[in-house]
Curated annotation (Swiss-Prot), chains A, B:
Dual specificity isomerase that catalyzes the isomerization of both glucose-6-phosphate and mannose-6-phosphate to fructose-6-phosphate. Its EC number is 5.3.1.8, 5.3.1.9. The lineage of its organism: Archaea, Methanobacteriati, Thermoplasmatota, Thermoplasmata, Thermoplasmatales. It is an enzyme of class 5 (isomerase). It comes from Thermoplasma volcanium (strain ATCC 51530 / DSM 4299 / JCM 9571 / NBRC 15438 / GSS1). This is Bifunctional phosphoglucose/phosphomannose isomerase.
Amino acid sequence: MQFSEELLTLKDQVRFDKSFKVGKYDKIVIAGMGGSGIAGRIFSEIYDEKPVFLVDDYDIPSFVDDKTEFIAISYSGNTEETISASEEAAKKHANVHAITSGGSLSKMGFDTIIIPSGLQPRSSIGYLLMPLVNTFIKPKIGDVDEAYRLLSETDKDNEEEKSIASEIYNGEHIPVIYGSRPFRAIAYRWKTQFNENAKVLAYSNYFSELNHNDTMPLKDTYRKDEFYFLVFRSDDSRFSKRITVTEKITGNSFRMVDVRGSSLLAKLFYLIHFGDYLTYHLAELRGVDPQDVSLIEKLKKEIA
Amino acid sequence: MQFSEELLTLKDQVRFDKSFKVGKYDKIVIAGMGGSGIAGRIFSEIYDEKPVFLVDDYDIPSFVDDKTEFIAISYSGNTEETISASEEAAKKHANVHAITSGGSLSKMGFDTIIIPSGLQPRSSIGYLLMPLVNTFIKPKIGDVDEAYRLLSETDKDNEEEKSIASEIYNGEHIPVIYGSRPFRAIAYRWKTQFNENAKVLAYSNYFSELNHNDTMPLKDTYRKDEFYFLVFRSDDSRFSKRITVTEKITGNSFRMVDVRGSSLLAKLFYLIHFGDYLTYHLAELRGVDPQDVSLIEKLKKEIA
């Protein structure tokens, strides 16, 4: 499947309706790396009924116990950090679940949701995220439908994404993405998509934390014109004010990205898909294969 | 006080022996922004007996309740996000504590540790961090003494820091700092010190997560030579192997930073201080005032 075809599957992924049965628990721990880990990051920002703790490492925290819902996410099912963390969680009698398309993780005896294989992990974000949303948030059908519609529209018209990609390409810019709650993790998702799809270094940060550090160099850093600041528009007046004032006092003109949609679910997926197309177009302009992650595979082999 | 004099106070700060009395709790929530927020970030990486949740925003998660130890950290005591979060926590009957040098936060009736005023918040990291360490970890006297000794040595000899600063200055490089557990937060601390002290944009990331995204562009990104990769050496073989292999397959030569010390506390403070001097020297070379954060102050006024 071509990468552009992978992108067309996202709209259907939001209709993926599997969920876990969970018992009594007082905290959730989600383990996952890279493209699989993003699902946990996004979920942890939109759910706060119980503490959600993310593990993107080999080891799990001491507090994991039999009151912990532990969810291991690995698209391939063979991510060594996630396998290691899951084994530790099982030893501590956590209630371990898994989301994977196969691999070792699917054979460890955990309560597992199997998702379709054949995609890049980062192109399966709907399959990876929706089981979390279905289990703990239970979205309205209308919200899922709205997300489906917005994703379909983005598939048909992504001229704005293409135009931003051109600007970045022409200036050989270093993309920096600024989000704000509840889209901090999406800003990070864009950073990783720039990395993996377009093979350019990119960074993300978020309001208002960045007003306590990035703000100083935004005015007087060297190489300032080499950066390209993409900022998600916020309908929270506390953040929108900070964005406007930051632009003004640092003498920058941010490229604002409108967040379309009315439900949170639709907004999240709309923004995700915007970043998918933006980085896909940049890959095309650069003449690099957006699917190619051979270096990451090579690294996995060398350290195994 | 000159910035260089502020740096000389750090060794004494690690001997700051105040702590909170805590009752029964099942989770810890720490609120703080920027230079004050770093203390929570560092603490959350070295303590895992109970879940630690960080708040760097106006609002607190729904799960905050009367079993929550809530610690508000604001050097000035006037950080609007932290004040807002603390008020919300008090309403939810969390056990609220504060660490501050004064301001509104000191007058809100919380159980408060007052720390010396007159420093930049980022230069008071010892005062901000040690109450957390003293309360929940209880360091050995020998570890505190080791940290004191290493910091004193760094105060007397920071030639290596100066030499790295020169390289970065001469190439007008964009610093990127790669850490690994338990020093991920220190990598972020360095990023913020580059921002606030030297007024240059800088970024941080950590192993092994970065092997799932940054690794691709590390080989073929445009502008590759403009970056300067600082990597903390790790004595965890899983990370040290990843560092070596990443360098090799991406064709980069990282500037490795040795982590001196034997106790974790000493290592943490040694690395913090290394970054302090490195960014201070870069500020000097650039001819900018490391103490100047007038833009951040201006922003605070404009949004108030």
